[in-house]
C-alpha cells in the first residue's frame, strides 16, 4: 500500500479552510495530520467543523508532518517556511512566497541545502479560462489586466501587487 504524505496546515482563516477542504478531498494523496491557528476561537471552531486535530503550536505541527501548507498572512511566510525547511519538511506556501525578493532567495537556498521542495500557490494557473488558451497560437504584443471585484480588506497585509496583481504577472 502506498504511504500517504502527512500534511499539516498553518492558518485556519478563510483560505486556510479552503486548503483544509481540498486536502480532505485528496485523501488518496495526503493524510491530513491537522492544523494550527494562533487564534484559540478559530482553532476550536475549525477543529469541530472539520473533525480534525488542532496542534498547540506551529512547531508541533511542523514536527509531525511531511509537508507544511502555509496559509497565513504574508508577513509570517518567511519565518514559518524557514522553520519547516530547517526541519526537513516540504513546503507549500500560499502566494506570495515572501514579502521580499531577498527572503524568497533565502528560502530557495535553504530548500536546496536541505533537499526539500518549496511550491507557491498560484491558483490562477488552473483557471478554466486560462487553460482554454493552451494550444492556441498566440503572440500577444500588449496585455492589459482588469480586476472586477469589490475590495476585500483581508488581504491588506501586503500591497495590491503582491496580493492580486501577482496572479496577472504569473500568468504573463
List each model region and its residues.
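Short, well-ordered coil/turn segments that N-cap beta-strands
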Residues: 30, 89, 116-117
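Beta-loop-alpha module in the N-terminal Rossmann-like domain of NAD(P)-dependent dehydrogenases
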Residues: 19, 50-108
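Conserved acidic residues
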Residues: 33, 66, 141
